């Protein structure tokens, strides 16, 4: 018997809805990253995007444990000398609540073109409303 290799054209993708309210950031991000990669499927192939679409609602209500709300720092650089920027979790969740979950999931995906393609299937919304009711996403309990 030969090893099965999934073809990009034959992959069946589903839509899932995840409610992030009162969920721990890292735990929900690992489950989302696994689903985006397609590792939960029997036909998973490392070099093919076999993952599903994930719609996350209530991203503003995600939480972190311990003192990470003040202590977790996100860094970015403007690429100019002295251009290192930093912002705490507490301030970033107020300023751009969707970015917190996006940063966590993106760091768990492969780096390169395949990882960017997987990341495009993640749709994050700060509140309970989303624009994907036409796709009829299934509720995913994590």
Swiss-Prot record:
Q: Which HAMAP family match?
A: Ribosomal_uL13
Keywords, alphabetical: Ribonucleoprotein, Ribosomal protein
Q: What is the lineage of its organism?
A: Bacteria, Pseudomonadati, Pseudomonadota, Gammaproteobacteria, Alteromonadales
Q: Which GO terms describe its molecular function?
A: mRNA binding; structural constituent of ribosome
What's a Pfam family in this record?
Ribosomal_L13
Quaternary structure, per UniProt, is:
Part of the 50S ribosomal subunit.
Q: Which GO terms describe its cellular component?
A: cytosolic large ribosomal subunit
User: What is the role of the protein in this entry?
Assistant: This protein is one of the early assembly proteins of the 50S ribosomal subunit, although it is not seen to bind rRNA by itself. It is important during the early stages of 50S assembly.
Q: From the Swiss-Prot or TrEMBL record, give the protein name.
A: Large ribosomal subunit protein uL13
Which GO biological process categories is it annotated with?
negative regulation of translation; translation
Family named by the database record:
Belongs to the universal ribosomal protein uL13 family.
């Amino acid at each position: 018997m030969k090893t099965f290799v999934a073809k990009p054209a034959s992959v069946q993708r589903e839509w899932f809805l995840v409610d992030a309210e009162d969920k721990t950031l890292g735990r929900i991000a690992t489950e989302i990253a696994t689903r985006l990669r397609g590792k939960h499927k029997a036909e998973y192939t490392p070099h093919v995007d076999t993952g599903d679409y994930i719609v996350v609602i209530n991203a503003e209500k995600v939480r972190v444990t311990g003192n990470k709300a003040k202590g977790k720092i996100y860094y970015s650089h403007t690429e100019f000398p002295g251009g290192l920027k930093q912002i705490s979790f507490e301030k970033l969740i107020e300023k751009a609540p969707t970015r917190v979950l996006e940063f966590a999931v993106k760091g768990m995906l492969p780096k390169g073109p395949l990882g960017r393609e997987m990341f495009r299937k993640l749709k994050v919304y700060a509140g309970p409303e989303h624009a994907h009711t036409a796709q009829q996403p299934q509720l995913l309990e994590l």
